[in-house]
Design a protein with these regions (language model features):
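ATP-binding/phosphotransfer module of carbohydrate and carboxylate kinases, centering on a glycine-rich
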Residues: 1-67, 77-82, 99-107, 124-131, ...
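Short beta-strand segments
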Residues: 9, 68-74, 112, 134-141, ...
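Short beta-strand scaffold segments in enzyme catalytic cores
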Residues: 15-19, 120, 142-148
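Short clusters of small/polar residues that mark proteolytic maturation junctions
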Residues: 30-32, 87, 157-159
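A charged helix-plus-loop insertion that forms the helical arch/lid used to bind
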Residues: 81-93
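Short alpha-helical segments enriched in small residues
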Residues: 115-118
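Structural signature of FAD isoalloxazine-binding scaffolds in flavoprotein oxidoreductases
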Residues: 160-164
Length: 337
């Protein structure tokens, strides 16, 4: 029987999994189970077993018919070994997860980080795109991934390539200082473009006289709860929310211009929760505004026919399943020949 390939996206709370056949066609829906990552990798492996068994049952095959597993984690890794904790339990760090899972299942395993997986997923579902693809995904932090023509993600020597949130941008706080990033440095793009940054910026704005009567100035909710409301407020035209997202979009585009200058991708894909927002077209305009301010003219209005514009922007299409789809695609590419 032709082999099938499994993609597993391990998050802090859930595992999203998918199975594809030898032709790369998804079989059945995405299967989701709890990840239990804080309980250690052995507990998560038990959940992976559940997901794989359910996928195989839905596809009408046995686990023996699985030819490879692609796995992504919310942590840096290299050669199958996780070396940064991120949202995982302590015993994940320093462990060769690929070797452990291979020994448990008898199936070859490849692992990368979650943003790389999502980038591969976005590449794999764009069947007409044959060039390189840069994914930039604002979320709690700001992640990214770069897929080369042919579908291979660039991971770097240490698995740290495309930490896009930690390129420097020259934007100052109201006090004239560069904002501090969670990585310990100052001036990182993530310190402006992330949920963590949005909370700080909201708190700073609410201290200003012009927002004294804004309903978010109520003492009845935390800054986290207030920031959670901003997307809905922006969708309904709230001036404060729009101001905050407009600045985020502009700075994101400004930083993307530097990434484009280094990587020269034909397509930039924007991921994260804003891909599902009702004001995403407006946000993309703000991103392009920052990009056009910083980008070389060749990336804005190329003299090369026929496009005339060499850098295209699109929103992510894979949704929550992009990473698992990307890892199934990777497993098929690595182990299917």
């Amino acid at each position: 029987m032709p082999k099938h390939f499994v993609g597993l996206d391990i998050g802090g709370s859930t595992i999203k999994s998918v199975i594809v056949n030898s032709a790369g066609e998804q079989i059945g829906p995405i299967v989701e189970v709890k990840s239990l990552v804080k309980n250690g990798y052995e507990a998560t492996f038990g959940q992976l077993d559940l997901a794989i068994n359910e996928l195989c049952a839905g596809a009408g095959i046995s686990v023996a018919d699985v030819g490879g597993i692609g796995l992504d984690v919310p942590a840096p890794s290299s050669g199958g070994v996780i070396w940064g904790k991120a949202n995982l339990g302590d015993d994940w760090v320093g462990t060769d997860i690929c070797a452990k899972l291979n020994a448990r299942t008898g199936i070859p395993v490849h692992m990368t980080n979650d943003c790389n997986a999502a980038a591969i997923g976005e590449y794999s579902i764009r069947h007409k795109h044959i060039g390189s693809l840069l994914l930039v995904a604002p979320g709690t932090g700001l992640g990214g991934g770069f897929v080369l023509p042919g579908g291979k993600v660039y991971e770097g020597t240490n698995g740290l390539a495309l930490e896009v949130g930690h390129i420097s941008v020259p934007f100052l706080e109201d006090n004239g200082e560069l904002p501090a990033c969670t990585c310990g440095l100052k001036g990182c793009m993530e310190a402006w473009v992330s949920l963590v940054a949005l909370r700080r910026c909201l708190q700073n704005e609410l201290r200003k006289p012009e927002w004294a009567t804004h309903h978010l100035n109520s003492p009845d909710s935390t800054i986290e709860e207030k920031a959670f409301q901003l997307r809905t407020l922006a969708e309904n035209g709230d001036a404060l929310a729009i101001q905050l997202f407009k600045r985020q979009g502009y700075i994101l585009g400004y930083g993307i211009a530097d990434l484009v200058r280094v990587l020269d991708p034909g397509l930039v894909v924007l991921g994260g929760g804003l891909a599902e927002s009702k004001f995403r077209d407006q946000f993309l305009d703000w991103v392009k505004g920052g990009f056009n301010e910083r980008a070389w003219s060749v990336y804005r209005h190329s003299p090369i026919e026929p496009e005339k514009i060499t850098t295209h922007f699109e929103w992510a299409e894979g949704g929550d399943g992009a990473a698992s789809i990307g890892m199934a695609y990777t497993a098929r590419e690595l182990f299917g020949h």
